[in-house]
Amino acid sequence: KTSNEAALKNESYLTTLEEIKQKHFETITNLVAKKNQNDLLVTITNEIKQLKTLLDGCFLIGELSPRTSDAIVSFGELLSSQIIAVALQEKVSDAIFKDSRELLKTNSNFGKATINLKLTNSLISNYFNSFKQSVVLLPGFIASDEKGNTTTLGRGGSDFTAAILANGCKATSLEIWTDVSGMFTANPKLVKQAKPIESISYHEAMELSHFGAKVLY
Protein backbone atom coordinates (compact mmCIF):
# COMPACT_ATOMS: atom_id res chain seq x y z
CA LYS A 1 0.00 0.00 0.00
CA THR A 2 2.64 2.53 1.06
CA SER A 3 4.84 1.95 -1.98
CA ASN A 4 1.87 2.21 -4.34
CA GLU A 5 0.82 5.48 -2.72
CA ALA A 6 4.32 6.86 -3.24
CA ALA A 7 4.52 5.69 -6.86
CA LEU A 8 1.18 7.38 -7.56
CA LYS A 9 2.60 10.62 -6.12
CA ASN A 10 0.13 10.49 -3.27
CA GLU A 11 1.70 12.19 -0.26
CA SER A 12 -0.41 10.05 2.04
CA TYR A 13 2.47 7.55 1.93
CA LEU A 14 4.16 9.71 4.56
CA THR A 15 1.18 9.31 6.89
CA THR A 16 1.12 5.57 6.30
CA LEU A 17 4.85 5.34 6.97
CA GLU A 18 4.43 7.20 10.25
CA GLU A 19 1.68 4.78 11.24
CA ILE A 20 4.00 1.87 10.48
CA LYS A 21 6.73 3.45 12.59
CA GLN A 22 4.41 4.04 15.55
CA LYS A 23 3.01 0.52 15.35
CA HIS A 24 6.52 -0.93 15.63
CA PHE A 25 7.39 1.45 18.47
CA GLU A 26 4.26 0.32 20.34
CA THR A 27 5.24 -3.31 19.80
CA ILE A 28 8.68 -2.64 21.26
CA THR A 29 7.13 -0.91 24.28
CA ASN A 30 4.78 -3.83 24.90
CA LEU A 31 7.16 -6.68 24.14
CA VAL A 32 10.67 -5.63 25.15
CA ALA A 33 11.99 -4.81 28.62
CA LYS A 34 12.51 -1.09 29.14
CA LYS A 35 16.27 -1.44 29.64
CA ASN A 36 16.60 -2.94 26.15
CA GLN A 37 14.30 -0.56 24.31
CA ASN A 38 16.59 2.38 23.52
CA ASP A 39 19.10 0.56 21.31
CA LEU A 40 16.31 -1.28 19.52
CA LEU A 41 14.39 1.95 18.92
CA VAL A 42 17.51 3.42 17.31
CA THR A 43 17.88 0.34 15.08
CA ILE A 44 14.24 0.44 14.00
CA THR A 45 14.39 4.20 13.43
CA ASN A 46 17.38 3.76 11.12
CA GLU A 47 15.57 1.01 9.20
CA ILE A 48 12.52 3.26 8.82
CA LYS A 49 14.77 6.03 7.48
CA GLN A 50 16.10 3.66 4.81
CA LEU A 51 12.55 2.71 3.94
CA LYS A 52 11.57 6.37 3.66
CA THR A 53 14.47 7.00 1.28
CA LEU A 54 13.17 4.27 -1.03
CA LEU A 55 9.62 5.57 -0.83
CA ASP A 56 10.74 9.14 -1.48
CA GLY A 57 12.47 7.89 -4.62
CA CYS A 58 9.26 6.22 -5.81
CA PHE A 59 7.38 9.45 -5.17
CA LEU A 60 9.87 11.59 -7.08
CA ILE A 61 9.96 9.44 -10.22
CA GLY A 62 6.39 8.19 -9.99
CA GLU A 63 7.40 4.59 -10.49
CA LEU A 64 7.79 1.37 -8.53
CA SER A 65 10.17 -1.10 -10.15
CA PRO A 66 10.19 -4.80 -9.19
CA ARG A 67 13.66 -4.39 -7.66
CA THR A 68 12.59 -1.43 -5.54
CA SER A 69 9.39 -3.22 -4.58
CA ASP A 70 11.39 -6.15 -3.21
CA ALA A 71 13.63 -3.79 -1.25
CA ILE A 72 10.59 -2.06 0.24
CA VAL A 73 8.54 -5.13 1.19
CA SER A 74 11.61 -6.72 2.82
CA PHE A 75 11.36 -4.22 5.67
CA GLY A 76 8.30 -5.98 7.06
CA GLU A 77 10.35 -9.09 7.82
CA LEU A 78 13.46 -7.17 8.83
CA LEU A 79 11.69 -4.93 11.33
CA SER A 80 9.59 -7.63 12.98
CA SER A 81 12.40 -10.19 13.21
CA GLN A 82 14.79 -7.74 14.86
CA ILE A 83 12.18 -6.87 17.47
CA ILE A 84 11.45 -10.55 18.13
CA ALA A 85 15.19 -11.25 18.35
CA VAL A 86 15.68 -8.73 21.17
CA ALA A 87 12.62 -10.05 23.01
CA LEU A 88 13.95 -13.59 22.60
CA GLN A 89 17.37 -12.59 23.94
CA GLU A 90 15.70 -11.66 27.21
CA LYS A 91 14.74 -15.33 27.58
CA VAL A 92 17.71 -16.95 25.82
CA SER A 93 20.81 -14.86 26.43
CA ASP A 94 22.90 -16.21 23.54
CA ALA A 95 20.15 -15.98 20.90
CA ILE A 96 21.17 -13.85 17.91
CA PHE A 97 19.68 -12.24 14.81
CA LYS A 98 21.07 -13.17 11.39
CA ASP A 99 20.10 -11.45 8.15
CA SER A 100 18.84 -14.17 5.78
CA ARG A 101 20.09 -12.19 2.79
CA GLU A 102 23.63 -13.14 3.76
CA LEU A 103 22.84 -16.85 3.40
CA LEU A 104 20.06 -17.18 0.83
CA LYS A 105 21.24 -16.39 -2.70
CA THR A 106 18.98 -16.14 -5.72
CA ASN A 107 18.77 -14.98 -9.31
CA SER A 108 17.48 -11.47 -10.06
CA ASN A 109 13.87 -12.41 -10.77
CA PHE A 110 12.49 -9.80 -8.40
CA GLY A 111 9.15 -10.67 -6.83
CA LYS A 112 9.63 -14.43 -7.10
CA ALA A 113 13.33 -15.16 -7.17
CA THR A 114 14.77 -18.64 -7.67
CA ILE A 115 17.19 -19.96 -5.08
CA ASN A 116 20.74 -20.86 -6.06
CA LEU A 117 20.70 -24.03 -3.97
CA LYS A 118 24.35 -24.96 -4.37
CA LEU A 119 25.65 -21.59 -3.19
CA THR A 120 22.93 -21.19 -0.58
CA ASN A 121 23.52 -24.63 0.94
CA SER A 122 27.25 -23.92 1.11
CA LEU A 123 26.71 -20.60 2.89
CA ILE A 124 24.19 -22.09 5.32
CA SER A 125 26.42 -25.07 6.08
CA ASN A 126 29.49 -22.91 6.68
CA TYR A 127 27.57 -20.55 8.92
CA PHE A 128 25.94 -23.16 11.11
CA ASN A 129 29.11 -25.26 11.35
CA SER A 130 30.80 -22.29 13.02
CA PHE A 131 27.67 -21.31 14.92
CA LYS A 132 27.91 -21.61 18.71
CA GLN A 133 24.75 -19.86 19.89
CA SER A 134 21.81 -21.98 21.00
CA VAL A 135 19.24 -20.03 18.95
CA VAL A 136 19.48 -18.00 15.74
CA LEU A 137 16.55 -16.00 14.39
CA LEU A 138 16.42 -15.27 10.66
CA PRO A 139 13.75 -13.33 8.75
CA GLY A 140 11.83 -15.32 6.16
CA PHE A 141 10.79 -14.41 2.62
CA ILE A 142 13.91 -12.37 1.77
CA ALA A 143 17.19 -13.21 0.05
CA SER A 144 19.70 -11.43 -2.20
CA ASP A 145 21.10 -11.81 -5.71
CA GLU A 146 24.77 -12.00 -6.73
CA LYS A 147 24.98 -8.18 -6.74
CA GLY A 148 23.64 -7.91 -3.21
CA ASN A 149 20.23 -6.61 -4.24
CA THR A 150 17.37 -7.67 -1.99
CA THR A 151 15.08 -10.27 -3.55
CA THR A 152 11.92 -11.97 -2.31
CA LEU A 153 10.75 -15.56 -2.64
CA GLY A 154 7.12 -14.94 -3.53
CA ARG A 155 3.97 -16.21 -1.84
CA GLY A 156 4.76 -18.67 0.94
CA GLY A 157 8.35 -17.41 0.97
CA SER A 158 8.70 -17.51 4.75
CA ASP A 159 7.81 -21.21 4.94
CA PHE A 160 10.11 -21.79 1.99
CA THR A 161 12.92 -20.01 3.85
CA ALA A 162 12.51 -22.40 6.77
CA ALA A 163 12.67 -25.39 4.43
CA ILE A 164 15.79 -24.06 2.71
CA LEU A 165 17.54 -23.45 6.03
CA ALA A 166 16.56 -26.88 7.36
CA ASN A 167 17.90 -28.52 4.21
CA GLY A 168 21.11 -26.49 4.22
CA CYS A 169 22.05 -27.32 7.80
CA LYS A 170 20.78 -30.91 7.50
CA ALA A 171 18.23 -30.50 10.27
CA THR A 172 16.54 -33.68 11.47
CA SER A 173 13.15 -31.98 11.63
CA LEU A 174 11.35 -28.82 10.50
CA GLU A 175 8.31 -27.39 12.27
CA ILE A 176 6.14 -24.78 10.57
CA TRP A 177 3.60 -23.09 12.79
CA THR A 178 0.48 -21.76 11.09
CA ASP A 179 -3.06 -20.78 12.03
CA VAL A 180 -4.28 -24.22 10.91
CA SER A 181 -3.75 -27.41 12.94
CA GLY A 182 -2.06 -29.73 10.48
CA MET A 183 -2.88 -30.60 6.87
CA PHE A 184 -6.47 -30.66 5.66
CA THR A 185 -8.28 -32.19 2.70
CA ALA A 186 -8.91 -28.62 1.50
CA ASN A 187 -8.32 -25.07 2.65
CA PRO A 188 -10.48 -24.86 5.82
CA LYS A 189 -10.83 -21.12 5.31
CA LEU A 190 -12.64 -21.80 2.06
CA VAL A 191 -14.20 -25.23 2.57
CA LYS A 192 -16.10 -25.73 5.83
CA GLN A 193 -16.24 -29.51 5.36
CA ALA A 194 -12.44 -29.82 5.16
CA LYS A 195 -11.05 -32.52 7.43
CA PRO A 196 -7.56 -32.99 8.90
CA ILE A 197 -5.31 -35.61 7.30
CA GLU A 198 -3.96 -37.93 10.01
CA SER A 199 -0.98 -39.19 8.01
CA ILE A 200 0.56 -38.76 4.58
CA SER A 201 3.44 -40.42 2.75
CA TYR A 202 6.45 -38.52 1.42
CA HIS A 203 5.37 -39.41 -2.11
CA GLU A 204 1.88 -37.99 -1.56
CA ALA A 205 3.33 -34.87 0.04
CA MET A 206 5.64 -34.41 -2.94
CA GLU A 207 2.70 -34.69 -5.33
CA LEU A 208 0.78 -32.08 -3.35
CA SER A 209 3.73 -29.70 -3.40
CA HIS A 210 3.86 -29.90 -7.19
CA PHE A 211 0.25 -28.76 -7.31
CA GLY A 212 0.90 -25.73 -5.12
CA ALA A 213 0.02 -26.94 -1.63
CA LYS A 214 1.18 -24.47 1.00
CA VAL A 215 3.83 -25.35 3.61
CA LEU A 216 5.24 -28.22 1.51
CA TYR A 217 8.49 -27.49 -0.34
Residue ranges with predicted function:
Residues K1-Y217:
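Nucleotide/pyrophosphate-binding catalytic subdomain
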